Amino acid sequence: MIKGDIRKQQILDTAERLFTSRGFEATSVQDILDEMRLSKGSFYHHYATKEDLLRKICENRAERTAPKTDEQEASPQNGLQRMNGYLHEMIPFHGEGMVFLKMICPVFSNAVGKSVREGYADALKKAWAPYIEQALAEMIREGSGYTQYPEMTSSIAMDLVNDLWQQLGDEIIGSSHALDPQISASLLLEKIEPYRCALENLMCAPYGSLELLKLQDILNAIDTVHEWKS
């Protein structure tokens, strides 16, 4: 890695740490410069705005959610089980995705947030495409799914999943009142049902074979947002 690339990554790492610990809105470019003892010229040589930093951080996080090749090969799951697991892991309501959700909470619904969300969704789709396509191919071979257009079907499936988590995020973050978390989670699970049915129909998968999100995933997302709001 050349010197300029190293500096660029160091800025990203520092910004991510500060955004996570202090919050995106509470962290200024000057805070990042002070932390690194860096000049403004050096910063702006790599990034135009703080928003550009957030966008790149989130895209990197999306790329890291995809499974490692050795993990995939070691898994004893069949195609349908893989598909269920992959679609679940794409949704940023657990693991690496929770850090993304926490960082983007303050700007989730404004122009910056929507741009970051689009970048994250695009990066997710690019990172997960080969795995979703492979799982679908396994489903077809095993008889648990069918389509004449596997590549297009995989693309549409990922678009549905990306739309789902953004819709749920809008519901959770945009809520002006704090319901009991269990009640909120139950209501949100109902909103998942049309997406689940659409995905099963798209792949000709058995009814009820895809789960997408568990109740605990929704509760974790609600807790993260409530923590930010409080």
Regions found by a protein language model. Give the residues of each.
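Short coil/turn segments at alpha/beta junctions that flank glycine-rich nucleotide-binding fingerprints
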Residues: S21-E25, P76, E142
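Helix-turn-helix
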Residues: Q10, L18-D52, K56
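Hydrophobic/aromatic residues within well-ordered alpha-helical segments
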Residues: K50, R61, T65, M90, ...
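C-terminal peripheral helix-coil segments that are non-catalytic and often amphipathic
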Residues: K126, P130-A137, R141, Q166-S230
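Generic hydrophobic, amphipathic alpha-helix propensity
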Residues: R7-A15, I32, I57-R61, T65, ...
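Short secondary-structure transition hinges
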Residues: G95-Q134, R141-S155, P181-Q182
